[in-house]
Amino acid sequence: MKHIVQQIHFIGIGGAGMSGIAEVLLNLGYQVSGSDLAEGAVTKRLKGLGVVIHIGHDPKNIGTTEAVVISTAVAGNNPEVLAARAAKIPVIQRAVMLGELMRLKQGIAIAGTHGKTTTASLVASVLAEGGLDPTFVIGGKLNSAGANARLGRGDFIVVEADESDASFLQLFPAMEVVTNIDADHMDTYQHDMARLKQAFVQFIQRMPFYGVAVLCIDDANVRDIIPFVSQPVLRYGLSDDADIRAANVRADGTRMHFTVDRRTVRRHGNKPGPLNITLNLPGLHNVRNALAAIGIATELGVGDEAITKALSEFGGVGRRFQRYGEIPLDSGGSFTLIDDYGHHPVEMSATLAAARGAYPDRRLVLAFQPHRYTRTRDCFGEFVQVLRSFDALVLTDVYPAGEAKIPGADGKSLMKAAIAEEKNSKALLNSAAVAYAASITEMPEKLRQVLKDGDVLITMGAGSIFALPHTLSEAKHV
């Protein structure tokens, strides 16, 4: 590509998926520019690396670029898109550019409705500890690297494969992981689960004959598609028929301990033995994510010592059960602050279970911003069940992500339903422990009404709530 195109412009460069690709291309020697609506930590970092950053969208930003990269969040009437098309400059989707990057190395693509970022981070960390020095482009900041992307010298590139817009069908990886298949972004699949499953089968079939699909056998929908996959499959999970199987699982604060039985044969012919794992992450869902990384590493011949060391020393990922420490309360005492990206009921339930395991004797308080009206509508009942499983709750309205408002699928409706539900159940949540904030800026005041000494506060959501933990930690008290 480089002998034809040297200047590349990203519209919406501050997005997690876009910024990582931009950084790797810059390190490969391309001239990279980008624009975004607002300046943030990501754009500042990219600017410091040498990317030309424009704040705001303007046709002039296109300049002499030879290719323009957009995500599905960028509208077709964006002024820079219109200018590029008028000038006959190619406008390509983010997934297409990611696919071009993957042509340079052997791709390891992590797919699934939930857990992609953590699993990709674990895979990258284990391969790095094993001396394979991978390139990675992931959706969150890998704390050990201080970034969500890195150009390695090794033969492999670890990426996230996005099913939300079916763009994972643009990729041709050599190895794949599927963590789970759940009903989300169903507009893409005409609200048909069969179509969604078929898309994952198509994704797996894009691998070459020497590839391997590492699939979570614990997930019913993943199990359903295995008979339709012709490529080699490595099954992982806690199920008895898993090839990479965890057992003797126990929680120890924010760490998990378990043994791993590997019933596979390494590519170089030596049968791997059992492993004793200490994972520096909480929750059963992260045990499964670690098993996926163990499966990939085992297939690539990474040594057992490197696998166990990488998992025990894993530094975490930004906004995935990210711990901010203790925050003092004005009323006396303090609370523990944790931030998480979860925005689907399944993800929220997994985080809740991890928190209950890590902090079994403490109240769990949730500050939640729903994400997208369609998801709130489609998963309304599941959201209510999760919300009322916390001990206290502060809700705000839905982050629309460009969607039009849907009556009855908003924050106030969720709050009312969560309170009403308790009358017919043994839910822990009660109306005295619930508050509604009209905006994110009102949340600190509402939290003062519900937080008590010793509480664990989890801020959760995929929208503008990402700024709340920073606000709370910088204030040094609530």
UniProtKB/Swiss-Prot annotation:
**Location within or outside the cell:** Cytoplasm
Part of which pathway? Cell wall biogenesis; peptidoglycan biosynthesis
- Which Gene Ontology molecular-function terms are recorded? ATP binding; UDP-N-acetylmuramate-L-alanine ligase activity
The record's section on SUPFAM superfamilies has: MurCD N-terminal domain, MurD-like peptide ligases, catalytic domain, MurD-like peptide ligases, peptide-binding domain
Annotated EC: 6.3.2.8
Return the Pfam families for the record. Mur_ligase, Mur_ligase_C, Mur_ligase_M
Record: residues binding ATP: 112-118
Q: Can you state which reaction this protein catalyses?
A: UDP-N-acetyl-alpha-D-muramate + L-alanine + ATP = UDP-N-acetyl-alpha-D-muramoyl-L-alanine + ADP + phosphate + H(+)
Question: Which region is the signal sequence?
Answer: none
EC class, as a word, reads ligase
Q: Name one GO cellular component term.
A: cytoplasm
Keywords, A to Z?
Answer: ATP-binding, Cell cycle, Cell division, Cell shape, Cell wall biogenesis/degradation, Cytoplasm, Ligase, Nucleotide-binding, Peptidoglycan synthesis
Q: Which domain of life is it from?
A: Bacteria
This protein's record includes keyword Ligase: yes
A single GO BP term for this record reads: cell wall organization
Annotated InterPro entries: Mur-like_cat_sf, Mur_ligase_C, Mur_ligase_C_dom_sf, Mur_ligase_cen, Mur_ligase_N, MurCDEF_pg_biosynth, UDP-N-AcMur_Ala_ligase_MurC
Per the similarity annotation, which family is this? Answer: Belongs to the MurCDEF family.
Q: What does this protein do?
A: Cell wall formation.
Show the PANTHER family listed in the entry: UDP-N-ACETYLMURAMATE--L-ALANINE LIGASE (PTHR43445:SF3), UDP-N-ACETYLMURAMATE--L-ALANINE LIGASE-RELATED (PTHR43445)
- Name by which UniProt lists this protein: UDP-N-acetylmuramate--L-alanine ligase
Recorded name of the encoding gene: murC
